[in-house]
Amino acid sequence: MPGIIVGVDGSDHSRLALAWAMREAVQHHVPLTVISVHPAPVRPATQIFWPVPDDLPDRSYDPEFARKALQGLVDQVAREIAETAPEITVSVALGDAAEELVNASRDADMLVVGSRGSGGFTRLLMGSVSSQVTHHAACPVVIIPGGR
């Protein structure tokens, strides 16, 4: 059963999206997949003169630490909504958040994201990830607005 996918980046908007998606998963008895995507490291411009091999490990991203942090957030939100938690899978990835969520949407009944994320620039109406997944996801998309 595909279920619900929710994108989480640690922002308040994504936390609200996570809580909403959990409630929906409980209500409809479907599994929930929580995905957090960390941006791929940008190679310094000095590589033009001193190339760095592509297979050099990135020391700034620790997938196990990221997975544990995401699981901690999921557990905390599950306690706050005080409902029986649905079947939850957590997943972390390195790359472009919109691209990863669009790819994941191919196997989902619904994709849930917050209206704005933790990016440095805010768009007029929606964050860039929520805007991109709205246009390219393979399943229905729910955009959760921030609290007031």
Could you tell me what each predicted segment is?
Residues 110-135:
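Glycine-rich, Arg-bearing micro-motifs that act as flexible, cationic patches
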